[in-house]
């Protein structure tokens, strides 16, 4: 299994397929999360992400290995951005490649949900009149 784990200032959305391509893979699944313009009926102006980078990378590697073992993946990619991000900007990219599509679909969902639960990356939402640190959840 080959993994590509990074904390980055900007997400390169073009890297997913090129990295995940593998001669034994019949399926590739990629999830890209971006900043949406509202949360709970409030307009979002921007988000700010910060990470405990060394711990985040270790936990992302553990998650990638768990997924690989459970779904027999050829490759896993997990990139998360830090810093200030505006509406529509990508903030996270996760993906998996496997022999069959069902495995990579399930693995990709596990990767993003588990990243949000376990990885020490924090998000602050900026609204018109307030700022709020968000509690992690899948």
Which residues make up each language-model segment?
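Short hydrophobic/aromatic beta-strand micro-patches
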Residues: 95-97
